[in-house]
Amino acid sequence: MKQLWAPWRMTYIENHENVDGCVFCNAQAKEDSADNLIAHRGERAYVILNRYPYTGGHLMVVPFEHKAILEELDAQTRGEMMELTSRCMIILRKLYKPQGFNMGANIGEAAGAGVKEHVHIHIVPRWKG
């Protein structure tokens, strides 16, 4: 597969700028429920399911602090984000049995960030074919 195309993401692509405030700050301010999609809250960051996933199991690790780039976060927050990312990959391997992962952050508009004002790490399980 040369391109990862998820047609169900068109709703996000066409409407993502209609959200009042920051989607990640809004999510973390709500109580945990199926509606806000938060799977885990740590001390400095949380794990949230992607509402418009590229694949099943697409998760994001998001700091509670509203910062646009990783280097604006303190070392403890960056460390917790990487620990949560690793734990997510362990769990996803057990549940989804992916053959690989795409993991990373799109920082800035030129890098393809959909929410460029609040840095976050994507964890996308992948399979061949």
Annotate each language-model stretch with its function.
Residues 1-129:
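HIT superfamily nucleotide-processing domains
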